[in-house]
Amino acid sequence: MQHIKHMRTAVRLARYALDHDETPVACIFVHTPTGQVMAYGMNDTNKSLTGVAHAEFMGIDQIKAMLGSRGVVDVFKDITLYVTVEPCIMCASALKQLDIGKVVFGCGNERFGGNGTVLSVNHDTCTLVPKNNSAAGYESIPGILRKEAIMLLRYFYVRQNERAPKPRSKSDRVLDKNTFPPMEWSKYLNEEAFIETFGDDYRTCFANKVDLSSNSVDWDLIDSHQDNIIQELEEQCKMFKFNVHKKSKV
């Protein structure tokens, strides 16, 4: 499944963020027609001390730098965003206004989720959207490598965060590797959309509120340091940019 392939890349980038003292939330922007990675982002709130420096905005800035503001509007309908954690309400609104094609995410955002957990910004009718966007929303697919995304967040929150306004006592921080909340598919998809997305073989996952994969977590993926991920992504983004310029000259 292409979704798993691309989400693995996003998870690797989130692990890199964790190793650099950032909240482990990361994303990649994939050009859907070609399957090429065109931009990436990870949270930068700790380093920048900027509350809006979310992974999605970091990637959007890369696309703007590459294509210009007008180019962003033209290309976003052909982009699939893979992000380890459900976009917050702010990011979900920005993605909708940019007319993004699709969002695929790992785990829900229990406090600020904008794709179904708290609000369904991607489907509401009040957010401003481009005039040519008759659908007034975007498709959102949850639960891809969900447990891996949850575990990276747990790794972060059991650490001492010096920038937290009220640091928790170390004795209160216990790493849980065994239990996970139910996967509430119905918050994001109805059963018909779920089956259309994942296939009838997974129908019972919807009813039983369980993950698509087995109960195991890919520990190798989330426990390995990802020192080369930035270089890999930079090379992929350069290749996409090269192909864009090559096409524009034809």
From Swiss-Prot:
Binding positions (Zn(2+)): H54, C88, C91
Cofactor(s) essential for the protein: Zn(2+)
Enzyme class: hydrolase
Any Pfam family matching the protein: dCMP_cyt_deam_1
Keyword Nucleus recorded: yes
Main location: cytoplasm
InterPro entries according to UniProt: APOBEC/CMP_deaminase_Zn-bd (IPR016192), CMP_dCMP_dom (IPR002125), Cytidine_deaminase-like (IPR016193)
Residues forming the catalytic site: E56 (proton donor)
Entries under SUPFAM superfamilies matching the protein: Cytidine deaminase-like
Molecular function per GO: tRNA-specific adenosine deaminase activity; tRNA-specific adenosine-34 deaminase activity; zinc ion binding
Reaction equations catalysed: adenosine(34) in tRNA + H2O + H(+) = inosine(34) in tRNA + NH4(+)
Keywords noted in UniProt: Cytoplasm, Hydrolase, Metal-binding, Nucleus, tRNA processing, Zinc
Record-annotated CMP/dCMP-type deaminase domain positions: 1-119
GO biological process: tRNA modification; tRNA wobble adenosine to inosine editing
Coiled coil: none
Oligomeric form and interacting partners: Heterodimer with TAD3.
Biological role stated in the UniProt entry: Structural subunit of tRNA-specific adenosine deaminase, which deaminates adenosine-34 (the first, also called wobble position of the anticodon) to inosine in many tRNAs. Inosine-34 allows the decoding of 3 different nucleotides at the third position of mRNA codons, as inosine is able to pair with U, C, and A.
Miscellaneous note of the record: Present with 830 molecules/cell in log phase SD medium.
Protein name: tRNA-specific adenosine deaminase subunit TAD2
